[in-house]
Each structure stands twice: as C-alpha cells, then as structure tokens.
Amino acid sequence: LQSLRLSGLVVSQGNISGMFEPLSGLTSLDVSNWTISDSPNLSGTFAPLSSLSSLNASSWDVSGATSLGGLFSGCAKIESLDLSGWDVSRVCDFSSMFAGDAALASLDLSSWDMESARDLSSMFSGCESLESLDLSGWALSKAENTSAMFSACESLTSPNLSAWRVSGTTNLSELFQGYVASSTPDFSNWVI
C-alpha cells in the first residue's frame, strides 16, 4: 500500500498515537478535513512514515491536543508542511515533533501560541535540510526542556529567537549541537 485517502475522518476523544505505524511504505496520505479537536494525544501519529512525501494536515483543528511529541518524527522525505493555522495553545509536549525530517526545507510556525509548551527537546533534531524556520512569535515562558532542539540542523540559517523568555528553562543542553551556519542566532533579550 503506497497511497491512502482518509479525508473527512472524525476522531472523537480518541488516541491516534502511532496510528500509521504498520503502514511505513506509504508515499502519499490524504488526511485533509479531519475532525480531531477532542484528541489530546497526537504523539507519533505519522511516525515513522519514512517514505511519505506528500501530507496535507493544514486544516486540522488540534486545539484539544496536549501532546504532539514525535508527530512527524522520521518522515524523512517530506519537504514542506503548512501548519501555520494550527492552534497549539494547550500543547505541552512538542518533543521530537519533526525529528529526523531530513528533507524538510522550510517551516513557518511564527503564529503558534507556545505559552503552554514545556518540552521542546529534539523538536527539530536531524532536520538537516531545514534552511528557513520562523519562530519569531514564540514566547516560551513555561518551557522546561529545550535540549537538542536544533541538533544536527546543518543548513539552518539564523533563527529569530530574540523574543524567547527562557528564564524558567532548566535544560538548554546541546540546544544547537551540530549547528554550522555562518550567522549566530540572536540571544540579546534572553534572561537565563
């Protein structure tokens, strides 16, 4: 099975974590117009769909989610995702959300309300093709763990992190491990 169309699916108060795990050979997946607003745990939903190159989840209502950990982890062939309209205001766990998405080239998450975010460890780890990442609107006042968040992001140009409030963050270890860009991120407003 290489292509699957599941548009219009209604998931009511369910856990769809790891839902597609047995279908690792999928290259195309239509999950448009899903109703998942009552699903708190979306962790690992698309992991590890390493052959998947096409995915449209832009219309998802994730306002009821508290965990997006590993959601797209290991989707190594996906080059772009439009998640700009997502309401992630209740999400605490973003760990490894895009980890290992080696072909992902750009991502605009600037409109995300990150006030509830606690764990962002390895969120973009291994996104080696990621050049453009807009996180400019983020305020991370409750974030506790950002370890290895940008680890092995070899192509990333200077992300705008100037608005981040990291005074409550207890783990910043290896935040930029493997970061080789010529420009330095702006930490001028950070209070640690």
PLM feature segments, named:
Residues 1-192:
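Negatively charged
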